Design a protein with these regions (language model features):
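N-terminal binding-site loop/beta-alpha segment at the start of enzyme catalytic domains
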Residues: 1-62, 66, 130, 200
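Active-site mouth loops of central-metabolism enzymes
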Residues: 3-15, 76-88, 116-121
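Short, acidic/polar
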Residues: 12-24, 83-101, 151-154, 176-177
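Beta/alpha (TIM)-barrel catalytic core signal, keyed to glycine-rich beta->alpha loops juxtaposed to Asp/Glu
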Residues: 13, 113-272
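Structural motif corresponding to the early beta-alpha repeats
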Residues: 60-87, 112
Length: 272
């Protein structure tokens, strides 16, 4: 299953269960989370999945993605023993995620972010090796990485035994919508997931040409940005907590921008 739109669950806290159920009720079939209690409530996603299963929404109908978060991304709530070797940390976090999510497999498992910048470190390679093992054992259909730069991704593509199948990055219009990383993804058949498409780009939502596109399509500027992302080859994430916005966001699947409109936004015309 390759999703066209993903519901993100960061910062939902105690509302996570009800929001995930609302998102699936609205029509989302892909859920993104992380085993990072500082920002995510992964176990509450699992509670939602349990409730949904009882109502006939099968696990097989959903794309489920979570992440291994390195120690620097945690507060004092760490889902693994940080004194263990990195491969064991990944294994503990992965098994904890399966338990939280009431599943025996993931559709996608990501490294939440590299251990070092601008290149990859020995720690990154050790963790990637652990993700490869999980993929080979059938625990995750795809493996990938989030918050990655062009150098890191190109190195991973060139040298990894199991190539990344997913990249998830924040997208800024004034930085070309992460063009360099997206080009690597396109050339290598990697699913590019874009997050913060709205919150990182408020000027785009107010830009008169984008507002005019929304008027032409009978939607709002937010849906134009999501549709642009789809037509530019991204799989967008939304983390809205508003049930009406969930339904509105999904309308992006029903509209079509012209190639000229896509190019206009992608090449900076959508940025005032």
């Amino acid at each position: 299953m390759t999703p066209s739109f993903i519901y993100g669950t960061a910062w939902k806290k105690d509302a996570t269960t009800e929001l995930v159920k609302a998102a699936v009720g609205a029509g989302f079939r892909a859920i993104d989370t992380a085993n990072q209690p500082k920002h995510y409530s992964e176990a509450l996603v699992g509670e939602a999945l349990k409730d949904l299963a009882a109502k006939g929404v099968s696990r097989d109908s959903l794309f489920l993605q979570t992440k291994f978060t390195p120690i620097d991304g945690h507060d004092n709530r760490v889902p693994y023993d940080p004194q263990l070797p990195l491969k064991e940390q990944v294994r503990q976090s992965f098994e904890s995620s399966l338990q939280h999510l009431n599943t025996d497999r993931l559709d996608s498992y990501l490294l939440h972010g590299p251990y070092s910048y601008p290149g990859l470190s020995d720690a990154d390679w050790e963790v990637w090796g652990a993700l490869e093992d999980i993929h080979r054992s059938g625990g995750a259909g795809r493996i990938g990485i989030s918050n990655v730069n062009q150098l890191q991704l190109s190195t991973l593509v060139q040298k990894a035994s199991v190539k990344p199948a997913v990249v998830q990055n924040r997208c800024y219009a004034n930085r070309g919508w992460d063009r360099e990383v997206r080009e690597i993804c396109k050339a290598n058949g990697i699913m590019y997931q874009g997050f913060s498409l709205l919150t990182a780009n408020p000027p785009v939502l107010r830009h008169p040409p984008v507002v005019a596109m929304a008027r032409r399509c009978g939607v709002n500027p937010e849906q134009i940005v999501f549709r642009f992302a789809m037509q530019a080859g991204m799989t967008p994430l939304t983390g809205t907590t508003d049930a009406r916005h969930m339904q509105e966001d999904l309308k992006a699947l029903e509209i079509e921008l012209t190639p000229e409109e896509v190019k206009f936004i992608e090449t900076g015309g959508g940025t005032p």
